[in-house]
Design a protein with these regions (language model features):
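A substrate-binding/cap region within the structured catalytic cores of diverse enzymes
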Residues: 155-182, 189-221, 225, 405-412
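A non-catalytic, amphipathic alpha-helix used as a structural packing/dimerization or gating element
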Residues: 168, 172, 215, 219, ...
Length: 426
């Protein structure tokens, strides 16, 4: 696979950022102690034109090959507990990110070493640093076996001071993820769980009241972002009223547009107002929003018409796992990946076969089925997010300090306090 024609991507970013800093400081080496300018002089009346500030992300996108841009769209799994196997995959496909599961994770130091190894693989030939993510919602969805544990979102929402407890759980979780080199969390859940028989959301949700869920989503997003973590709310347009698990089937939610606006939309609107980094799509069909029968993940009406145009979101959209039945029942995995990008998704999570999904998207770009402008738009969003969250600048962590942060006395005390609040609130 081609890299970038020999152009040094991250070196270019560093150089352009330095130029931008110089421009912000005046962009001139002229002396500032030459004495005051006389009142009424031409110099006093003339304001020099500001030096345009270069955009390092735009410069980086221009320097990338089409193959490397397509790689940025993917978030595959990695194998093993060391970087050896994952590094080969990163070197071949140059993905935008990877996702960890328990089979990758043994101890805090081991995970930090794994993360650093994968970031070194991504940096070869001046490649782009990785998003390294996981599903650490706490409660019943927790991937790190050694993390400081907190109750479910539903339990946190039940305490007398849910704001404080949600904030504490997100802060501690974010700090521990960052310590082991995980810079992105697929959390918090923004679904309003109004169906008691919901087999997939349930206690992962903050509850059934859209206003309360929206408020606590905002609290969690702020707390995650304060730790430097890329937060991801899920599952748009709302997975809270289903009796079908999208891992094994394709749910149909019979909400009208009016019901969606009242019930499902508020948590996502709040997340957007709180500058959420990423929004994950749902593999669900909502005929009241799009009567095509396509899953929301592959619906331009939902991802572009509702999320982008109606709600005004311009951040990164990531699909839920493309290995799920809800994503593949109608079109198959490679075609699902192409249709998701065409609909407005920027990143593609966990295709069942990375090679075939990658080839399908690359072929679609080269044929024009996915316009180059759509690819560049997605990659620009991804890189800008990485720049804004410091991932382009500083992707590595100090593995020797990971065990001091994860499960620290302060974190364990905070978790015990929250657990006591949950017990007292019931």
């Amino acid at each position: 696979m081609r890299r970038t024609g020999g152009l040094r991507l991250l070196s270019a970013v560093a150089a352009i950022t330095a130029v931008a800093s110089a421009a912000a400081c005046g962009g001139s080496s002229a002396r500032s102690d030459d004495g005051p300018t006389r009142r009424g002089s031409a110099a006093a009346r003339t304001t020099p034109s500001p030096t345009p500030t270069p955009d390092p992300v735009a410069a980086l996108v221009r320097r990338m090959s089409t193959a490397d841009k397509v790689g940025q769209l993917f978030i595959p799994t990695v194998q093993g507990t060391t970087a050896a196997t994952g590094a080969a995959m990163v070197a071949k496909y140059h993905p935008g990110g990877v996702i960890y599961f328990p089979n990758n994770l043994r101890t805090a130091r081991q995970t930090a070493t794994l993360s650093n190894g994968l970031q070194r693989a991504a940096a070869k030939d001046d490649g782009v640093p990785l998003l390294i993510g996981t599903d650490e919602e706490q409660g019943i969805v927790s991937r790190l076996p050694y993390i400081t544990r907190f109750p479910t979102n539903k339990a946190l929402a039940s305490t007398k001071n849910p704001d404080d407890d949600v904030r504490t759980a997100a802060r501690v979780t974010g700090e521990e993820l960052r310590a082991v080199g995980i810079n992105q969390d697929f959390a918090p859940v923004a679904d309003v769980n109004v169906n008691p028989r919901n087999p997939v959301i349930g206690v992962r949700s903050f509850g059934a009241d859209p206003k309360e869920v929206a408020h606590l989503v905002g609290v969690a997003v702020d707390a995650y972002r304060a730790t430097g973590i890329v937060a991801t709310v899920k599952h748009f347009p709302g997975h809270g009223d289903t009796a079908t698990d999208s891992h094994t089937g394709l749910p149909v939610i019979k909400h009208s547009m009016a019901t969606w606006e009242r019930l499902d939309a508020p948590p996502f609107q709040t997340a957007i107002a709180h500058h959420i980094d990423m929004i994950m799509t749902a593999h669900i069909v909502v005929p009241g929003l799009d009567d095509s029968g396509d899953p929301a993940t592959m619906s331009k009406t939902v991802l572009t018409g509702l999320l982008r145009d109606k709600l005004g979101y311009d951040g990164v959209v990531v699909t839920d796992s493309l290995s799920m039945a809800g994503a593949t029942m109608k079109y198959g995995a490679p075609e699902a990946a192409v249709r998701a990008v065409r609909a407005g998704a920027d990143m593609l999570l966990m295709p069942p076969r990375l090679d075939s999904a990658y080839r399908a998207v690359l072929t679609a770009v080269r044929s024009g089925r996915i316009p180059q402008s759509r690819l560049d738009q997605a990659v620009t969003r991804i890189l800008r997010m990485k720049q804004d969250r410091g991932i382009l600048r500083s992707p590595y962590v100090d593995a020797s300090r990971a065990a001091d942060i994860v499960g620290s006395a302060e974190h364990r005390a905070a978790a015990r306090k929250v657990a006591a609040h949950v017990r007292a609130g019931r």
